[in-house]
């Protein structure tokens, strides 16, 4: 079948590759090249890099809704499907109406929960035990279209958003192929999104600042949910201390939240509003992420210091 693919980051690449293997991808739309690195050289998106390997035409509208030339090109292609995976732009009704069988979006959550830009992060920050991918028929709303297929994965207690990203990135391609086949042969019936929802808004760096009055479980979830970006942090003796790995000790302690009560090679124990957080991996300014065992081999972390002050 004739496909137009719209996607931008590395999350979209495995799905794109699956579509190339099984279908005829006639064109790719991706975000414009952006300055990257110290030299601020323009860098291609991961999807553009993959498209060029296969000599697939690439279009990079700043705003697709205003780009009449590209919209006319899409109409000329007359695709059976437009497939959207983390494209980064809203599609207008004019574009949604172009493909014969509709525009399908792969969204990295179990809709209707975690609509929005950062589902992989918020599902972990909120302490959920499962997540997954959903394919849906796109409409003019934000992640509000009728659902097609879902695939669940379990979230274990130490999983980071980066690890969840990598799992769903790989599994999404197969789900898209099943969705295309099912819509084509009529075996999939779209289902309206109903019930509880939570909007997974874009992350900001303010969210990453740890509040030690919170329950240790909530802080642990924040640390997992903000890894690999932007990384949860606190202050130790006025220096920013980023937390990469933690675990929770079910223990009530009367010290002020944020107080370091024990330091050994296994971690730094910190009092929280409820329970105790054990910090296992940190990064200080101008340093690399290190386990506590590695860090205290050449530096000190003092007991009784109150973090965040």
UniProtKB/Swiss-Prot annotation:
GO cellular component terms listed in the entry, alphabetical order: cytosol
Signal peptide: none
Keywords: Protein biosynthesis, Transferase
EC number(s) reported in the record: 2.1.2.9
Domain of life: Bacteria
Residues that coordinate or bind (6S)-5,6,7,8-tetrahydrofolate: 109-112
Annotated catalysed reactions: L-methionyl-tRNA(fMet) + (6R)-10-formyltetrahydrofolate = N-formyl-L-methionyl-tRNA(fMet) + (6S)-5,6,7,8-tetrahydrofolate + H(+)
Primary enzyme class: transferase
InterPro entries: Fmt, Formyl_trans_C, Formyl_trans_C_sf, Formyl_transf_N, Formyl_transf_N_sf, Formyl_transferase-like_C_sf, GART_AS, Met-tRNA-FMT_C
UniProt xrefs under CDD domains: FMT_core_Met-tRNA-FMT_N, Met_tRNA_FMT_C
Parts forming coiled coils: none
Disulfide topology: none
Gene3D superfamilies for the chain: Formyl transferase, C-terminal domain, Formyl transferase, N-terminal domain
GO molecular function: methionyl-tRNA formyltransferase activity
PANTHER family linked: METHIONYL-TRNA FORMYLTRANSFERASE (PTHR11138), METHIONYL-TRNA FORMYLTRANSFERASE, MITOCHONDRIAL (PTHR11138:SF5)
Alphabetical list of HAMAP family matching this protein: Formyl_trans
Family listed: Belongs to the Fmt family.
Protein function: Attaches a formyl group to the free amino group of methionyl-tRNA(fMet). The formyl group appears to play a dual role in the initiator identity of N-formylmethionyl-tRNA by promoting its recognition by IF2 and preventing the misappropriation of this tRNA by the elongation apparatus.
Name the record gives this protein: Methionyl-tRNA formyltransferase
Lineage: Bacteria, Bacillati, Bacillota, Clostridia, Eubacteriales
Gene: fmt
């Amino acid at each position: 079948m004739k496909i137009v693919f719209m996607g931008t980051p590395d999350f979209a690449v495995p799905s794109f590759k699956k579509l190339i293997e099984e279908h005829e991808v006639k064109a790719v739309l991706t975000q414009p090249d952006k300055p990257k690195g110290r030299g601020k050289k323009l860098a291609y998106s991961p999807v553009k890099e993959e498209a060029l390997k296969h000599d697939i035409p690439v279009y990079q509208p700043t705003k697709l809704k205003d780009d009449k030339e590209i919209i006319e090109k899409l109409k000329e292609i007359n695709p059976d499907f437009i497939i959207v995976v983390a494209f980064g732009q809203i599609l207008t009704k004019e574009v949604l109406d172009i493909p014969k069988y509709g525009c399908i979006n792969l969204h990295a959550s179990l809709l209707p929960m975690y609509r929005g830009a950062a589902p992989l992060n918020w599902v972990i920050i909120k302490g959920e035990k499962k997540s997954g991918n959903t394919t849906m028929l796109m409409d003019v709303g934000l992640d509000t279209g009728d659902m097609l297929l879902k695939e669940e994965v379990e979230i274990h207690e130490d999983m980071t958003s980066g690890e969840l990203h990598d799992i769903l990135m790989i599994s999404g391609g197969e789900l898209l192929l099943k969705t295309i086949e099912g819509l084509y042969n009529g075996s999939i019936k779209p289902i309206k999104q109903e019930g509880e929802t939570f909007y997974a808004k874009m992350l900001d760096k303010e969210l990453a600042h740890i509040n030690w009055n919170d329950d240790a479980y909530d802080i642990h979830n924040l640390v997992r949910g903000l890894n690999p970006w932007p990384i949860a942090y606190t202050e130790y003796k006025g220096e920013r201390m980023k937390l990469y790995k933690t675990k929770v000790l079910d223990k009530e302690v009367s010290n002020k939240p944020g107080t370091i009560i024990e330091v050994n090679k296994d971690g730094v124990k910190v009092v929280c509003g409820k329970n105790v957080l054990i910090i296992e991996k940190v990064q200080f300014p101008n340093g690399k992420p290190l386990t506590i065992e590695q860090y205290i081999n050449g530096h000190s972390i003092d007991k009784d210091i109150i973090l965040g002050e």
